[in-house]
Curated annotation (Swiss-Prot):
Monomer. Could be a mediator in iron transactions between iron acquisition and iron-requiring processes, such as synthesis and/or repair of Fe-S clusters in biosynthetic enzymes. GO terms for cellular component: cytosol. GO terms for biological process: cellular response to oxidative stress. This is Probable Fe(2+)-trafficking protein. Keywords: Iron. Belongs to the Fe(2+)-trafficking protein family. InterPro entries: Fe_traffick_prot_YggX, Fe_traffick_prot_YggX_sf. Pfam families: Iron_traffic. One of its GO terms (molecular function) is iron ion binding. Coiled coil: none annotated.
Amino acid sequence: MSRTIFCTFLQREAEGQDFQLYPGELGKRIYNEISKEAWAQWQHKQTMLINEKKLNMMNVEHRKLLEQEMINFLFEGKDVHIEGYTPEEKK
């Protein structure tokens, strides 16, 4: 049975995560406040960010950068800036 939460990213009720996806207090906050739909949007942005900036997840500084971008995107309403990327226009 799925959980319904108020997603702070989407600003509406949505299906919550099945389990905590990220460690620590930030992971608890994501579990309680971020829906599956919002998390999928973040994963798409995260993949683009890792590829475009050639981030190495073995590098602590790169992981810190990615975590800060995640916080900015999910909780502070800031979009991820990827140089040279222009989003498709919605019709």
